[in-house]
Amino acid sequence: MDKKTRVLSAFNCQEVDRIPAGFWFHFPEDSCLGQEGIQHHLDFYHAIDADFIKIMCDGYFDYPNPYIPNIKKASDWRNLKPLGKDHPFIRGQVERCKAINDALQGECCTFYNVYNPMSSMRFGSSDEMLMAHLKEDPEAVMYALDVIAEDNAALAELVITEGGCDGIYYCVQNAE
């Protein structure tokens, strides 16, 4: 049974020859972007012979909305606007996925790591500010989360339709 069939069969509750396995970690910050980051993913995959790859979003943690550094009070979140599908933050991640998938030529399933909007917001600000603003004006923060979710949804769609990924790994950590 090939790797892709194994993973997709397991997802569909069908019989597999063995349990699919994959491992991942964050690559070094100083070498996670561009061709070097792409090569890290490919080298790691080939070294461990995993059944699938979780393509990491290393280098793309901070949601780069230019308005976020100007946020001082909770109501300021209402001024956030989506980055849009053509923003370099989104395009760079799609290009990473496409390069990795082109190199693998369908050998295995690939899933791109997408953080939830709360994590994206936290990466661009701070836990303390975010929690204070949630208490002060939850509707303003919810509005901003919806804006970030719009960008995250565009990213998820594009890494599949243009980047060639089989799906996303949706990370729901933070703000517990």
Residue ranges and their predicted role:
Residues 1-36, 40, 51-55, 85-176:
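Active-site loop segments of alpha/beta catalytic cores
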Residues 42-45, 49-62:
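Membrane helical hairpin/interfacial module
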Residues 58-93:
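N-terminal glycine-rich cofactor-binding segment that shapes the pocket for flavin-like pterin cofactors
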